[in-house]
Curated annotation (Swiss-Prot):
Top-level EC class: oxidoreductase
Lineage: Bacteria, Pseudomonadati, Pseudomonadota, Alphaproteobacteria, Rickettsiales
Protein name: Putative protein-disulfide oxidoreductase RP025
Pfam families: Thioredoxin_4
InterPro entries (alphabetical): Thioredoxin-like_fold (IPR012336), Thioredoxin-like_sf (IPR036249), Thioredoxin_CS (IPR017937), Thioredoxin_domain (IPR013766)
GO cellular component: periplasmic space
UniProt keyword list: Disulfide bond, Oxidoreductase, Periplasm, Redox-active center, Signal
Organism, as annotated: Rickettsia prowazekii (strain Madrid E)
């Protein structure tokens, strides 16, 4: 009997040990599960952090892609379009300022702006040679037209056209370009232009009347709007030989275009 009692006690103690071991094992599992939450954040907050992290990664990748696209786009934009000959119809009208032979079949149209530094350079260095070769020899009709980009351009162009004749126009045209650095960028440009006009024989009151002339202003705006429609017009100075725009304003390029136009006219006359 005593032996049976001892066996029962042994079995009871063994059973308790197994329960305690299982409890300890279970408690270990609970600790493992709870470890990610030891930073006092709820499961929802932890999940939100994961979402935010993933979002930042996606945005970062998109930014890299967009940067690459911008670089590719910029590299395409840096490629300047090639200027190809573009035919534009230009006819000499009564308001044009023409040098040379008005009846010539070769018409060279120059577009300039009074405040354009490149235009001033052209007229002081390249134009004299062109004038000697083609204008003084009456081979071409050379038309000078204004492209108005600023208020200074408008006021200066009006001064040059104030008298209305070609000689007065050329006189003021040359002075305005030669003195460009003195008046074009001054806050008192109107006063300086008035002084230039007075020295050239245009009193202040007469210049004021010209500034208020709708006819002169309309002519200048019409000239500007016409060339602005040319597909390859890229600014001043620009030149059109029988309606075809030249590559640039070098003496070689302009002479090449003029010589070709003269040769074409000669061939037409022979065939006729």
């Amino acid at each position: 009997m005593r032996n049976i009692f001892i066996v029962l006690i042994f079995l009871f103690l063994s059973n308790c040990s197994e329960v305690k071991a299982q409890d300890k094992k279970y408690e270990g599992k609970q600790i493992i599960v709870q470890e990610p939450l030891q930073n006092n954040k709820t499961p929802q907050e932890t999940n939100q952090e994961s979402i935010n992290s993933a979002t930042k990664s996606v945005v970062h990748n998109n930014d890299n892609n967009q940067t690459e696209e911008v670089l590719i786009h910029d590299s395409r934009e840096q490629k300047k379009p090639e200027i190809r000959p573009t035919k534009v119809t230009f006819k000499i009208d009564d308001n044009d300022m023409v040098l040379g032979n008005k009846k010539s079949n070769v018409i060279v149209v120059e577009y300039f702006s009074p405040t354009c530094p490149h235009c001033a350079y052209y007229h002081q260095t390249i134009f004299p040679e062109l004038k000697k070769k083609y204008i003084d020899t009456n081979k071409i009709a050379y038309v000078i037209r204004e492209f108005i980009a600023t208020k200074q351009d408008l006021d200066a162009a009006i001064l040059a056209r104030c008298k209305g004749d070609i000689n007065s126009f050329i006189q003021f045209h040359n002075i305005i370009l030669q003195q460009q650095d003195k008046w074009a960028y001054s806050n008192k440009y109107r006063e300086l232009l008035t002084d230039i006009g007075q020295l050239g024989g245009i009193p202040p009151e007469e210049y004021k009347q010209c500034l208020n002339s709708d006819k002169i202003t309309a002519t200048l705006i019409a000239n500007t709007n016409l060339v602005a429609k040319a597909p390859k017009f890229i600014g001043t100075p620009s030149f059109f030989v029988n309606g075809v725009q030249t590559e640039n304003y070098s003496i070689d390029n302009i002479s090449k275009a003029v010589d070709k136009a003269l040769d074409d006219e000669t061939k037409k006359q022979i065939n006729f």
